[in-house]
């Protein structure tokens, strides 16, 4: 029996390592990684340059709160703004955190910038998956996952055509 909370049925596959875009199980079978950690690990596995940079960073800092200035974070934010439309970057730990932040940013914009207390509706697609927080579940309208008998108001789901 596993001590990992069973949030969904798990596959019998057990991967031991990865290289490039491939995963390997305990028997040495090779699998092309189409899942990418549910679409969050698109960099592949064991790339020499990334391994070197990650090892260098491990010798410096692992994690700091964003209440502190972090030189590497500042450099990356500047670069992202230089090559995009954005003036600011909000770094997140996960897609779910990004969804929660986008919900808050959109609602804050309407409440503060447009001075509207009624414009808070967010449109999303039915059956979409945005994570497992209450806000992400409400945005997705994926009732199969929302077993908490609660929802957050202000979302309109439309069919994806």
What would you call each of these model-derived segments?
Residues 1-88:
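N-terminal glycine-rich, Lys/His-bearing helix-loop that initiates the first secondary-structure elements
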Residues 78-161:
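PLP-dependent aspartate aminotransferase-fold enzymes
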